[in-house]
Amino acid sequence: MSRAIEVEKITKTYRVKSRRGLFKSSVEFVEAVKGISFTANYGSIVCLLGPNGAGKTTTIKILATLLLPDSGSARVAGYDVVEEASKVRENIGLMLTVEKGFYGKLNGRENLEYFAALYGLPRNIALKRIEHLVKLLELDKLGADRKLYEEFSLGMKARLSLARALLKDAPILLLDEPTLGLDPPSARKIRELVRDMAHRENKSILYTTHNMFEAEIVCDRILLINKGVIVAEGSPEELKDKIPKLKVINLVIKASGDPGKPLERFTFRKEIKQEENSVFNVKMYVPKPEEVLGEIVKALVNSGHEVVNVRVEEPSLEDVFIYYSEGSI
């Protein structure tokens, strides 16, 4: 079987016009995607993981034929996204911003019937498919199949948006931040469904997120993307193994003053966050914590700070992303 998705050196630059004063304006060019390449197989979930503005949504829109790439090529289900756009659209289910495109004066079921008609599904098949999706996504339990869309909660909107993406039962799903802003139960439900669809129904799923935890538990393979460039790829464990063998010293400190001051002489990367009032969380990334931990604690105590808790941990996926996006940790 051919690859579900094949992307080869695609680029996309936006022309952004900004006004300067009453009569003057200037034009800037923003490179959203800078020659990225990757593939995705059927039966797996590939995650584009990166911060806002990294190029995730632009990539999804190119693969969905909503944007043309400036250069490079991409094939979805074996079809070229530029030359065979209609064939691409037949083979994908797309979920973008959860609130886009639905009709407020229709209920959930009526919205799905409307989109099924737009997609050209025969009515008898559409009604059976909608009934299946209403139960699968528990829209009936939430009353979302009967309530007007304008009365939906964000979680109900997300489930309906996913149902719309699944209407055609397409072999390839493009899901752009599907759990963004959702409460934990709704987010968990969507993550479980996504994994089930990939592994039981052999669908290929391209899933974007900026949530490290979500990427680690949902995705089979992760593409770390930053400023339009894929900086690393692999399974969560493979990515962790690629960075230098560092450990994380995690300290909780009750501080009397600036806790960073006594740590200045230690040249390791440090992250200091104030949790509440005088309580700080300090992370230090070191190759051999057993050689420096005593000195670190001593420096803090001698400066009048109370060390409440100390843990030595393996690097997280977040640490991996920091390493690849900033060059080192």
Positions of PLM-derived features:
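Residue-level marker of the N-terminal boundary of ABC ATPase nucleotide-binding domains
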Residues: 2-4, 30
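ABC transporter nucleotide-binding domains
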Residues: 13-226, 232
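An acidic, carboxylate-rich microenvironment
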Residues: 83, 87, 110, 125, ...
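ABC transporter nucleotide-binding domain
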Residues: 193-285
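Short, charged/small-residue-rich alpha-helical element at the C-terminal edge
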Residues: 248-320, 324, 329
